[in-house]
Structure formats: C-alpha cells, structure tokens
C-alpha cells in the first residue's frame, strides 16, 4: 500500500527565482526503505525536508505531496507540527544540532513525548529506556540526566533514533545519519537502522552519498543530480545495473577508491 506519493515537486529560491529541485516524482510503500543518493547540492535533503515543511520560508514548493492520504502542501504550520515526530520522524545528520545545549537530553525528549502522546511521565521514562536499551545505550538513566556536550556524536544520534522509535511513526526520514560519525560508530548506527528495518513496521527514507550504506539498507533507490531525479528503481537495478551515465560515474568512482584502498593495504602503491 502506498504511504507517500511525490508528484512534480519543484522547489524554488524565491529570493533569486532559481529552481533548486525540478519536477521530482517518486512513491514509497508502507514498510519500504527508499535510498536517496547524490552529491552535495543535488537537492536530496531539501526534497525530503519538504515532505514535512522543514525548509526555510524563502524556498517555495509546488507540486503534490500526499502522505497517508493527506495533502501535506495544503497544511498550515500548526497542522504540520502535529505530523512531525508522531507520524513522520526525522533523524538529522548531526545529533549535536538536534538538542538544545542548555538543558538535559532527557528533559527535551520528555517534552517531545508529552506533546505527541498522552503518556504519563513514568510511562514516557519506561518507553524511552526501553528503546535506549534496544539501541545499546548503556546506563540510560544517567544519559537522560546528561547535557548534550557530555555525550558522543554516536550516542546523540542513537538518542534521536530512540526518540523516533518511541513515537512509533509511519515514516522515518534519516538525513545522512552516519556522515558526521567515525567509522566504527557509523557501523553501529547503520546496524541499528538495518535492525529497525527488520523489526519495526515503519517506512524509511535514507539519504546518503555513501553507496555502500545505501546498498545495505535500501529496497529501492533514487538518484539525484542538480535538483533532478535522474534514475530510480530497485536497489539491484540502480546500484548493479545502472542506466544513467551519472549513476555509472558514481559507481565507477567508488570502485576506483575501493581498488586503491585495497592496493594500499597490500602495499602495492609506491611513490
């Protein structure tokens, strides 16, 4: 069953009249993971943020975005707020930017839960701890009492994921959630998303420029370049049998980097 339909989506900078995204079309079914790939500036993040109205006001959006039967572009800001978190959760690229540095992460998470649920304080704490345990965050009560600066980037990222899961959304949008992390933490966070894909009944849009990450988690893939969606299809078709020259370029570039790394590790590279 289709959960999200995006038709003829166009995003324009109203200050300059410059189109940033042009005529983008894609769908997402319930429980499916859609990978969105492209280089920086390709329009992938603003395309996905437009689903829940998180772009700056200067960006004008036209077209059609239908989420679970509702026209998202026709909603007011107050109506959109009811969807954010509860129905559509977003995991940002940098956990440090998602939390207010002046108060504890627990207080912020509790406030979000109170806005979107009718749970008591005790129920909220129990639910958050349950998902923090699920994401291997040790000593959750201590973490909830901590300020953001006291926690690592990986821990903050997993806290965002825990909060998203606690709200039981129909869709999680993950905007390059592994980019700002070290390699080991990247692996842990990616494994968490893969596990969510297996055990939770929610769709995901996973934005990344890392083809390895997308290959591990996506069911279908869309490729963006200069604000246009240039190719889409199953993970197998796009990443292993691409048709567009740009997709082929991305894959060949990644292969060259991987081959060079293998040569270096074997000691084959000389000055």
UniProtKB/Swiss-Prot annotation:
Residues 6-251 form the ABC transporter domain. Its EC number is 7.2.2.-. Nickel/cobalt import is reduced in the presence of zinc. GO terms for biological process: cobalt ion transport; nickel cation transport; transmembrane transport; zinc ion transport. GO terms for molecular function: ATP binding; ATP hydrolysis activity; transmembrane transporter activity. CDD domains: ABC_NikE_OppD_transporters (cd03257). Keywords: ATP-binding, Cell membrane, Cobalt, Cobalt transport, Ion transport, Membrane, Nickel, Nickel transport, Nucleotide-binding, Translocase, Transport, Zinc, Zinc transport. It is an enzyme of class 7 (translocase). The keyword Transport applies. One of its GO terms (cellular component) is plasma membrane. Gene3D superfamilies: P-loop containing nucleotide triphosphate hydrolases (3.40.50.300). PROSITE patterns: ABC_TRANSPORTER_1 (PS00211), ABC_TRANSPORTER_2 (PS50893). ATP binds at residues 38-45. It is a peripheral membrane protein. Induction: Repressed by zinc. Disruption phenotype: Deletion of the cntABCDF genes decreases nickel and cobalt intracellular levels and decreases virulence. Its main location: membrane. It is found in: Cell membrane. It holds the Pfam family ABC_tran. Part of the ABC transporter complex CntABCDF (Opp1) involved in the uptake of metal in complex with the metallophore staphylopine (StP). Involved in the import of divalent metals ions such as nickel, cobalt and zinc. Probably responsible for energy coupling to the transport system. Plays a major role in nickel/cobalt import in zinc-depleted conditions. Contributes to virulence. Required for full urease activity in vitro. The complex is composed of two ATP-binding proteins (CntD and CntF), two transmembrane proteins (CntB and CntC) and a solute-binding protein (CntA). Belongs to the ABC transporter superfamily. PANTHER family: DIPEPTIDE TRANSPORT ATP-BINDING PROTEIN DPPD, OLIGOPEPTIDE TRANSPORT ATP-BINDING PROTEIN APPD. This is Metal-staphylopine import system ATP-binding protein CntD. The lineage of its organism: Bacteria, Bacillati, Bacillota, Bacilli, Bacillales.
């Amino acid at each position: 069953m289709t959960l999200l339909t995006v038709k003829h989506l166009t995003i324009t900078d109203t200050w300059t009249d410059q189109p940033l995204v042009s005529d983008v079309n894609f769908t997402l079914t319930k429980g499916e993971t859609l990978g969105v790939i492209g280089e920086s500036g390709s329009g992938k993040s603003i395309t996905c943020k437009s689903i829940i109205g998180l772009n700056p006001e200067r960006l004008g959006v036209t077209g059609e975005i239908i989420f679970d039967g509702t026209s998202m572009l026709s909603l007011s800001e107050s109506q959109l707020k009811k969807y954010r978190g509860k129905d559509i959760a977003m995991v940002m690229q940098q956990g440090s930017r998602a939390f207010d540095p002046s108060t504890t992460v627990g207080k912020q998470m509790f406030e979000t839960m109170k806005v979107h649920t009718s749970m008591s304080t005790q129920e909220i704490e129990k639910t958050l701890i349950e998902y923090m345990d699920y994401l291997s965050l040790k000593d959750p009560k201590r973490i909830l009492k901590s300020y953001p600066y006291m926690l690592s980037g990986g821990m903050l990222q997993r806290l965002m994921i825990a909060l998203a899961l606690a709200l039981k959304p129909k869709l999680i949008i993950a905007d390059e959630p592994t980019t700002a992390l070290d390699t080991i933490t990247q692996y842990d966070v990616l494994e968490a998303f893969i596990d969510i894909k297996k055990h939770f009944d929610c769709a995901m849009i996973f934005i990344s420029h890392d083809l390895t990450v997308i290959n591990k988690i996506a069911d279908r893939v869309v490729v963006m370049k200069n604000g246009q969606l240039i190719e889409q299809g199953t993970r197998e078709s796009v990443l292993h049998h691409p048709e567009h020259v740009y997709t082929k370029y991305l894959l060949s570039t990644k292969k060259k980097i991987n081959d060079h790394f293998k040569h270096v590790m074997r000691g084959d590279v000389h000055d």
